[in-house]
Amino acid sequence: RSCVNSWNSPVFNLTGLTTLKLPFYASSILKLSSIENVCVSMPDLASTPRLIVGGGSNLVVLEPEFDGVVLRPEIQCFKPVQTGDDVYLEVGAGHSWHHTVMQTLNEGWFGLENLALIPGWMGAAPVQNIGAYGVELKDHCHRVKLYDFEEQAVIELAASELAFGYRHSILKESPDRFLVLTVTLKLSTRPQPRVEYGAIAEELQRQGLNASIPLDVAKAVMSIRQAKLPDPDETPNVGSFFKNPVVRTAVADRLKARFPEMPTYPDGEQTKILYLFVWYFRYGRCKTKYQYPSG
């Protein structure tokens, strides 16, 4: 919806594009439905302030007025190529992440089940290397197709070139340089569910689900997430997002000896991730609920 802002110029009300639904206005919006569309449009925007907005679950709007162009990567390709037990699936940046997870499971392509119900679009997934319940995007990312604003060209980077880390990638280091166009995932027709994460095993047992069936694992994950967070369509929120501390292995081991129930996870040879927030919330060490004023 167009209106007028403090710059005395036509703007678009984009409040509905973010899951927090905070006031958000931009001077223009450009919907990108294909790679060809990107190649034609982007050179003209080389010096224009721009903001990429996909599913809007990673965006907290602090300044309601953006004097620039909002880019909406709505590319919808879904191209599988099967090689033996492996399936290489190229997915457009505009696909819903959760819908992609469920579609792959229904097709019999496995690996993403632990990442069910993560909000947002496919294009954001490699930027911060999304992860949950013991699985990260890097475990199943084969390559990413990007538009490089510096080179003004479409390029491809293999997963090994993206420098994936804990909620990190080179795309996160250079947010103004790259626009994700498609992500190629490497999945398998042979299920290998990962249910070692305690909450999943407990939820599978509680519901009488089968730990060897990926779709059942996804159902358990969805139940866990739904119990923790409201539907953003009903109650605006940005989902469950936090980053646990990464410490040296020796420090993690000392803390583990003192607090045996505290979960840890290796992050390279010298460091471990401490799942402090999971531990606090799950074991009742942080039970207080806060209600912040909005508006």
Feature-to-residue mapping (PLM):
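Short, mixed-charge, low-aromatic patches
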Residues: 1, 54-59, 101-102, 176-177, ...
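Short N-terminal signal/transit or membrane-insertion segments
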Residues: 1-10, 105-119, 174-176, 180, ...
